[in-house]
A protein has these predicted regions:
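A binding-site-centric feature that preferentially detects glycan-recognition modules on secreted/surface proteins
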Residues: 1-119, 125-207
Length: 207
């Protein structure tokens, strides 16, 4: 799908209302050269943070959500190994869900991804990818976005949580049965493995 078509989809989902920018401004942010390209159009958190993007996700007619115990999602930034274009809208090339990295912990997966000449996705990138292709979120085939991490409150190092996107089972902590089957932005411990969560990555980024 061309970037112009992806921007149209985001406009249909309400990007103008979310950003307070009109269509002309958003087209200008992408740039004419990129509109005819392919890839995945990403909404930078400076334009719309992940917590506000998540409700645009849908599955089985249910909107996405951020787990209630992740109110600090906006404080998750980039790990040192990853750089993204400092523009409101940019493009990913070669996104992979990372199914072959299911049952790998984020700590184990990061060096493997880097050794392949790739980098992991951020949480905004993961949401942006699913907004364009919701079918990529499947039972037992979901993914972590380990490029987004939160610094520790005090001292060096990172908070032990890594964001992930999967499908809610309607647990009470998710808000109950009405959210069963909905897209869910949550977190996993960086040292834990999950048989149903891959580690998503990308070949390159551009603007």
């Amino acid at each position: 799908m061309f970037i112009a078509q992806q921007l149209d989809r985001l406009l249909d989902l309400g990007l103008e209302e979310l950003t307070g920018r009109d269509e002309e401004e958003l087209v200008e942010m992408v740039g004419g050269d990129l509109l005819a390209c392919t890839g995945t159009l990403v909404i930078h958190p400076s334009l719309v943070p992940a917590a506000r993007l998540a409700p645009l996700l849908t599955r089985l007619g249910k909107p996405g959500f951020v787990v209630p115990d992740m109110t600090d999602l906006g404080r998750f930034g980039l790990i040192p190994e990853v750089e993204v274009p400092e523009v409101p809208l940019y493009v990913l090339k070669g996104v992979e869900r990372g199914d072959d990295l299911r049952d790998w912990s984020p700590e184990e997966a990061l060096p493997e991804i880097l050794a392949r000449g790739r980098t992991p996705l951020t949480v905004n990138e993961g949401i942006s990818w699913l907004l364009q292709d919701p079918s990529r979120l499947e039972p037992n085939h979901c993914f972590m976005t380990i490029a987004s991490r939160k610094p520790k409150k005090a001292g060096p190092g990172l908070d032990k949580r890594t964001p992930a996107i999967w499908i809610s089972g309607g647990a009470e902590r998710d808000g109950g049965k009405e959210r069963d089957g909905a897209p869910k932005v949550g977190w996993c411990w960086a040292g834990n493995r999950h048989t149903w969560l891959g580690v998503a990555s990308v070949a390159g980024r551009g603007a």
